From Swiss-Prot:
<keyword id="KW-0547">Nucleotide-binding</keyword>
<dbReference type="InterPro" id="IPR050166">
    <property type="entry name" value="ABC_transporter_ATP-bind"/>
</dbReference>
<dbReference type="InterPro" id="IPR027417">
    <property type="entry name" value="P-loop_NTPase"/>
</dbReference>
<dbReference type="Pfam" id="PF00005">
    <property type="entry name" value="ABC_tran"/>
</dbReference>
<comment type="function">
    <text>Part of the ABC transporter complex SsuABC involved in aliphatic sulfonates import. Responsible for energy coupling to the transport system.</text>
</comment>
<keyword id="KW-1278">Translocase</keyword>
<dbReference type="GO" id="GO:0005524">
    <property type="term" value="F:ATP binding"/>
</dbReference>
<feature type="binding site">
    <location>
        <begin position="48"/>
        <end position="55"/>
    </location>
    <ligand>
        <name>ATP</name>
    </ligand>
</feature>
<dbReference type="GO" id="GO:0016887">
    <property type="term" value="F:ATP hydrolysis activity"/>
</dbReference>
<keyword id="KW-0067">ATP-binding</keyword>
<dbReference type="InterPro" id="IPR003593">
    <property type="entry name" value="AAA+_ATPase"/>
</dbReference>
<keyword id="KW-0997">Cell inner membrane</keyword>
<feature type="domain" description="ABC transporter">
    <location>
        <begin position="16"/>
        <end position="230"/>
    </location>
</feature>
<keyword id="KW-1003">Cell membrane</keyword>
<keyword id="KW-0813">Transport</keyword>
<dbReference type="InterPro" id="IPR003439">
    <property type="entry name" value="ABC_transporter-like_ATP-bd"/>
</dbReference>
<dbReference type="InterPro" id="IPR017871">
    <property type="entry name" value="ABC_transporter-like_CS"/>
</dbReference>
Length: 268
């Protein structure tokens, strides 16, 4: 038996609860008896190999997919941002932001949301004229304008170049701090998960393989004490073997490059 409860009050804690949730396609259980809580205002990153159930879980939380059994409790006010911005090409940026909303002050609300993501000057721009990063920021504004208590992010940075990705990381953190939704970020990037999240959970075969608290001060950097130990643990859970030689040679070079990019992005 499946139970879905939509919550429209911010006083309920935690706003996201899953109890013994199952989602299956034919005989295959993609989500297999999952228990999970996400607290109000908590930023959770979700890792897992391809086919582990990450996107199915996000679609379930977004209301785009049903569960077969178990209990699922989520806020009514939810929004999802996907890897593809999914903008309507024949509508301007501001009309994409308020797509599907029936509100009197639609343009003003859209302009406020676009201002928050740094795109006030692109209010009337059409998707074909936007860069990849700009299009993704419009998609993010579309989520924000709905004032979600739960913001779902399905690999929204995967198609962006390194510098744009770092800027988007900082934008997401700034907006999360301002609006305080619970956030679930689906990603394949272990470093991204550690940099952004309060917790990192790992799915394997539709089950919770681990739930790791990231107790590192922000602003985070891969050179912080404790970062590499969390990284190694997560990579191990994902079946990636790390060798001392790799850590001593390849990773420092990568970390220096990423650190330099972050300094450059923050300086602009």
């Amino acid at each position: 038996m499946a139970t879905l409860e939509l919550r429209n009050t911010s006083s309920v804690t935690p706003p996201v609860q899953l109890r013994n949730v199952v989602r299956q396609f034919g005989p295959q259980r993609v989500i297999d008896g999952l228990d999970l809580d996400i607290a109000a205002g908590e930023f959770v990153a979700l890792l897992g190999a391809s086919g582990s159930g990450k996107t199915t879980l996000l679609r379930t939380l977004a209301g785009l997919d049903d569960i077969d059994s178990g209990e699922l409790r989520v806020p009514v006010a939810r929004a999802a941002v996907f890897q593809e911005p999914r903008l309507m090409p024949w509508k301007s940026a501001w009309k994409n932001v308020v797509l599907g909303l029936r509100i009197n002050d639609a343009k003003a609300r859209a302009e406020a949301a676009l201002t928050e993501v740094g795109l006030a000057h692109r209010l009337n721009a059409f998707p074909a004229t936007l860069s990849g990063g700009e299009a993704q920021r419009v998609a993010l504004a579309r989520g924000l304008v709905r004032e979600p208590k739960l913001l779902l992010l399905d690999e929204p940075f995967a198609a962006l170049d390194a510098l744009t990705r770092i800027r988007m990381h900082q934008l997401i953190i700034d907006l999360w701090r301002k609006h305080t939704p619970a956030v679930l970020l689906v990603t394949h990037d272990v470093d991204e998960a550690i940099l952004l999240a309060d917790r990192v959970i790992v799915l394997a075969d539709g089950k919770l393989a681990d739930d790791i608290r990231v107790d590192l001060p922000r602003q985070r950097d891969s050179g912080q004490a404790g970062f590499q130990s969390i990284r190694s643990r997560l990579l191990g859970l994902l079946g990636v073997k790390t060798q001392a030689a790799d850590t001593a040679t390849q990773e420092p070079a990568r970390d220096v490059t990423l650190s330099a990019l972050r300094r450059f992005a923050n300086a602009r």
